Amino acid sequence: MAAMFRRSCRVLRSLSHFGWRSQHTKAVPQCEPGSGFSFELTEQQKEFQATARKFAREEIIPVAAEYDRTGEYPVPLLKRAWELGLMNTHIPESFGGLGLGIIDSCLITEELAYGCTGVQTAIEANTLGQVPLIIGGNYQQQKKYLGRMTEEPLMCAYCVTEPGAGSDVAGIKTKAEKKGDEYIINGQKMWITNGGKANWYFLLARSDPDPKAPASKAFTGFIVEADTPGVQIGRKEINMGQRCSDTRGIVFEDVRVPKENVLTGEGAGFKIAMGTFDKTRPPVAAGAVGLAQRALDEATKYALERKTFGKLLAEHQGISFLLADMAMKVELARLSYQRAAWEIDSGRRNTYYASIAKAYAADIANQLATDAVQVFGGNGFNTEYPVEKLMRDAKIYQIYEGTAQIQRIIIAREHIGRYKN
């Protein structure tokens, strides 16, 4: 299996981080480097996108409803995604990974989410757990924890949210007390995706006991192995949507973590945790776009099959205008995540664009899922049809990795700050 993954890496490693095109535009001759803006994907990117699309259509969609019904963790699909090189795409080449940019992973994420956002979220949660190590880990940490994920299909998780601290990350209560060459961690985390399946966690804890200490210095990021004594994994939560992903609470009781597992240094955790979102919010937005595209496609196909008052639904102006609005929204949301991904891949700070992409794509995913149910009418409210699942799955995009309201706070701060400066 590891050999298969490495072959996938060799095929896909040459992906370019420049240029893309909307999935509905015709290909045009590629522009020469430096000739200006282009929507065209490279041939390798098209191949990567096609691989993810084929996997989603042929292997995810046929079983998505059953996984949603049972809530079972989709182990066979995750193993298959790993074999195809569709997981762990951010891991640097020096540790056996693809070393892809954000736009490349967004292309994959949109296609996977089209098939099932529960499966996509399980995969994306791996990225969320890995990015803190990529931006804040040293060579030894990356080799040990990232390197082995390219040898076998392991999982990890981003362990930050608590029962009393969601959007208010600075309000977390989990404490890390240094004793000799170790830290003793005590606290409780909540809503941890992959919580019961992860082999290790990125954990954020308060290391400065002074309640007045600034967030930029009060918190430390740790790598915590899931089988460490004192780690108590809670029951799987039964959620509204994305039911096949694994979400749990985790208790840390006198968990001993060696100082070698501190990322960057004591007090650097908050910066690492927040910096992670600049890289992960564009793919989250891409996932929302994948769901929105699925909603549009399902609604359009149904409108071209169902007849009322002697003609197809799509021939009624009210429905055709609804589909037109849906199409506009999904294309604009796709552009927003592409801009955010391009900015970070170009080495620029993308906080503003990442929040715009995340907020807008999450909103339109919910709007389009609701509209798709409306087009289906009574059938849309029934589990025999796919759109009710889309409506349930969409809501979490407005909540996880920063709520819709938090994104607007960030956007307003960034926007107004430009005028003040």
From Swiss-Prot:
Which compartments is it annotated to reside in?
Answer: Mitochondrion matrix
Task: Give the GO cellular component terms, alphabetically.
Answer: axon; mitochondrial matrix; mitochondrial membrane
Q: Which Pfam families match?
A: Acyl-CoA_dh_1, Acyl-CoA_dh_M, Acyl-CoA_dh_N
Instruction: Please give the residue positions where the record annotates the modification N6-succinyllysine.
Output: K179, K212, K217, K259, K271
* Any Gene Ontology biological process: post-embryonic development
Tell me which EC number(s) this protein carries.
1.3.8.7
Q: Which PROSITE patterns match?
A: ACYL_COA_DH_1, ACYL_COA_DH_2
Does the keyword field hold NAD?
Answer: no
Its needed co-factors are: FAD
Q: In which pathway does it act?
A: Lipid metabolism; mitochondrial fatty acid beta-oxidation
The chemistry this enzyme catalyses reads: a medium-chain 2,3-saturated fatty acyl-CoA + oxidized [electron-transfer flavoprotein] + H(+) = a medium-chain (2E)-enoyl-CoA + reduced [electron-transfer flavoprotein]; pentanoyl-CoA + oxidized [electron-transfer flavoprotein] + H(+) = (2E)-pentenoyl-CoA + reduced [electron-transfer flavoprotein]; hexanoyl-CoA + oxidized [electron-transfer flavoprotein] + H(+) = (2E)-hexenoyl-CoA + reduced [electron-transfer flavoprotein]; octanoyl-CoA + oxidized [electron-transfer flavoprotein] + H(+) = (2E)-octenoyl-CoA + reduced [electron-transfer flavoprotein]
PTM annotation: Acetylated. Could occur at proximity of the cofactor-binding sites and reduce the catalytic activity. Could be deacetylated by SIRT3.
Give the transit peptide, as a residue range: 1-25
Q: Which domain of life is it from?
A: Eukaryota
State if Transit peptide is listed as a keyword.
Answer: yes
The record lists octanoyl-CoA as bound by: S167, S216, D278, R281, R349, T351, E401
Tell me which residues bind FAD. 158-167, 191-193, 306-308, 316-317, 374-378, 402-405
Alphabetical UniProt keywords: Acetylation, FAD, Fatty acid metabolism, Flavoprotein, Lipid metabolism, Mitochondrion, Oxidoreductase, Phosphoprotein, Transit peptide
At the top of the EC hierarchy, this enzyme's class is oxidoreductase
Q: Which residues carry this modification: Phosphothreonine?
A: T351
Q: How does it assemble?
A: Homotetramer. Interacts with the heterodimeric electron transfer flavoprotein ETF.
Family note: Belongs to the acyl-CoA dehydrogenase family.
Spell out the protein name for this chain: Medium-chain specific acyl-CoA dehydrogenase, mitochondrial
- Native source species: Sus scrofa (Pig)
What does the organism's lineage look like at the top?
Eukaryota, Metazoa, Chordata, Craniata, Vertebrata
The gene from which this protein is expressed is ACADM
